[in-house]
């Protein structure tokens, strides 16, 4: 497993986090108290019913493996944003516990007020500890709370990449004090995939960074400008880069105040012999709506009242060729308004090219996952990151606190 440094790292890294898989293989978990920080933050409807149980299903292998090894298992997660220090039925993990019971084929009791201990979990049994964000001090990474939680366990397992960018008591503090701290299978898989994509990538390395605003992705763009061979921009971000290249974009969404930043990124790439491909054709409309008429235009023919809502077919074909020839692909964001089919061709063509490419591909971000689902390519993307904000912060080159503390523990 690799460390999360963006520099070139060896495959046998002494500071890579310890893993649950290694502990299970060593056979030392029988009778041990194992505390798993999972990501069970699932969407619910107005009645509180779970609408997508993907995260719960993803958490089952780690829990089941610990139970099979004879461990006494405690699982917790956040759910929504409850007020700290008070019970909040709207954010209770009760529905999660019911679904977890079904998936594990056994009762999973839900415990409230658990931070002070006073409960026993027999080996081979599992309990769900109520929403960790109800505990005073969770979000501020309280040292006192972290030590109380660490006293409950012999082994701490972080299996929640989605919160790895937050230093909270259950993601960071407890890992400092637990007798053993390690990465669960979901977290370990994310570390491996991200390390493979940016630590030692097979070249050419192509990144697709798309979205409505340059401002929200500027740090990512600057970070990747030093690393990638082609930086494909899409959506409103591409409009700003087109402006920077001296092209007209009509009344399209753009950020003129960031033109200097866009030009700087183009220059950094060019100095390295890398490129930011600027579209040669685009799909325009006079309004932003599901029924808007789409018109394919050469980039030099965009009218003052046009809105650019997708890349054109020539651009899509050109970029698809680059993706098919890539060694590594990092994908964050659809290149057009793919929710409206007449503006979805660019994203569809690129998605298909990623699926057909021999490159190792990693994709992340909510809109990207929706596009992957729409075009049915999930089983042909090398790795789909569920991290959201953590995935973006990794692309920015930031240290993720939850991973950093596990690396520190491994090093010591």
Curated annotation (Swiss-Prot):
PANTHER family: PHOSPHOGLYCERATE KINASE (PTHR11406), PHOSPHOGLYCERATE KINASE 1, CHLOROPLASTIC-RELATED (PTHR11406:SF23). Monomer. GO terms for molecular function: ADP binding; ATP binding; phosphoglycerate kinase activity. One of its GO terms (cellular component) is cytosol. Pathway: Carbohydrate biosynthesis; Calvin cycle. ATP binds at residues 217, 339, 365-368. The keyword S-adenosyl-L-methionine does not apply. It is found in: Cytoplasm. One of its GO terms (biological process) is glycolytic process. InterPro entries: Phosphoglycerate_kinase, Phosphoglycerate_kinase_CS, Phosphoglycerate_kinase_N, Phosphoglycerate_kinase_sf. It catalyses: (2R)-3-phosphoglycerate + ATP = (2R)-3-phospho-glyceroyl phosphate + ADP. Its EC number is 2.7.2.3. It comes from the Bacteria. Keywords: ATP-binding, Calvin cycle, Cytoplasm, Kinase, Nucleotide-binding, Plasmid, Transferase. Belongs to the phosphoglycerate kinase family. Coiled coil: none annotated. This is Phosphoglycerate kinase, plasmid. PROSITE patterns: PGLYCERATE_KINASE (PS00111). Substrate binds at residues 39-41, 55, 78-81, 133, 166.
